[in-house]
Amino acid sequence: MTDVFPAGPGRYPAAAPASEALFDRACAIVPGGVNSPVRAFRAVGGTPRFIVRGEGPWLYDADGRRYVDLVCSWGPMILGHAHPAVVEALRSAAALGTSFGAPTPGEVELAAEIVDRAPVEQVRLVNSGTEATMSAIRLARGYTGRTRIIKFAGCYHGHSDALLAAAGSGVATLGLPDSPGVTGAAAGDTIVLPYNDLAAVEAVFAAEGPQIAAVITESAAGNMGVVAPRDNFNQRLAAVAHANGALLIVDEVMTGFRVSRAGWHGLDPCAADLWTYGKVMGGGLPAAAFGGRAEIMSQLAPVGPVYQAGTLSGNPLACAAGLATLRLADDALYRRLDETAAVVGRLAGEALAAAGVPHRLSSAGNMFSVFFTDADVFDYATASAQQVPAFKAFFHAMLAAGVYLPPSAFESWFVSAAIDDAALEQIAAALPAAAAAAAEVHGGSDGE
């Protein structure tokens, strides 16, 4: 392994011999030692922590260390880890069989729960957010008879070929321009524009409107760090798309059922045509969905000509975990998530300000990021201009003090309803030293 993190007081990654041994073993048999790139710690240096269990707000690694979890499996774990209701739902479902390749009552119940919460008339269950957005794009093309798609730089919609152009998430984390293996033909129908720039959208529609099938946007960007839409951006996107005969696809894989009972739509509604969901709706298991008006969804096979399928779609275990989670996700739970996120954000901001570290706290509901910059952040270019070395120092100081943050400056922080006073006290205790570490690096860095 190559340690790319600079040595220095309070900044060097703590030794983690059990995780190091597991990572060495994994690197021999798994590309990069991980099954999703951001987990490898390449953006922050050091060895990824191998997690052996979670309970409530806590993660426990292979070396026996305990961390307050501010990643929450990248969003899904709104109840915390191993919630008794979810564990019991999984135990009961598994006892009846794990997969049948046939319809089940559970998938009907989960679909009904989504339709009750979200602005969709019909929904199709799939296994991942990538499948959901990929299928929504195919459906939009089939419905409109058009080919071209508008997306926004820094917005991540999964790793399907057509949507990896100028993507956020791991692509931003690793500093990749785009992905080799994506052919010009696959990406050729994708138009990439700056986020929050309606004038750019209007200009493209003026030039190429009859070719554009859909605009796809994250409901609030969460994969370049958290950047909320400005000036009614989503509503204005819908108006421009509809005026030109195109659809608007809103990707709520991250925000859906996390920031409110109805997802981002509950905070900032817009007249989108198709919506995608994931993460929370699976309760920590692989599950996602896309949905919209019945008129559009009826174009899907077996009733329509647009083909989409999946062996494990609507898996009974995933449906059981998702239902157990959503049935506990009431307004009181969302108030708790909002309050907890506000406290954590305030504590982080106060510590960084006291240490003299330039920063911007950017939020979308209870999702938030800390950008290490004093400039306004409103799109991918401004998000990318932050002081990444300062984040690295901050990350490792927090990790050493028992707080697990996303190992990337370009990801959202997430809270769970399980975060209690003890967890908040641990976060508060960790922040001053982490802010000091960031200040030390920031003072001698020109950015990255």
Curated annotation (Swiss-Prot):
Cofactor: pyridoxal 5'-phosphate
GO biological process: protoporphyrinogen IX biosynthetic process
Pfam family, one: Aminotran_3
UniProt entry tagged with the keyword Amino-acid biosynthesis: no
Entries under CDD domains matching the protein: OAT_like (cd00610)
Enzyme class: isomerase
Reactions accelerated catalytically: (S)-4-amino-5-oxopentanoate = 5-aminolevulinate
Subunit-structure text: Homodimer.
This protein's name: Glutamate-1-semialdehyde 2,1-aminomutase
Protein species of origin: Salinispora tropica (strain ATCC BAA-916 / DSM 44818 / JCM 13857 / NBRC 105044 / CNB-440)
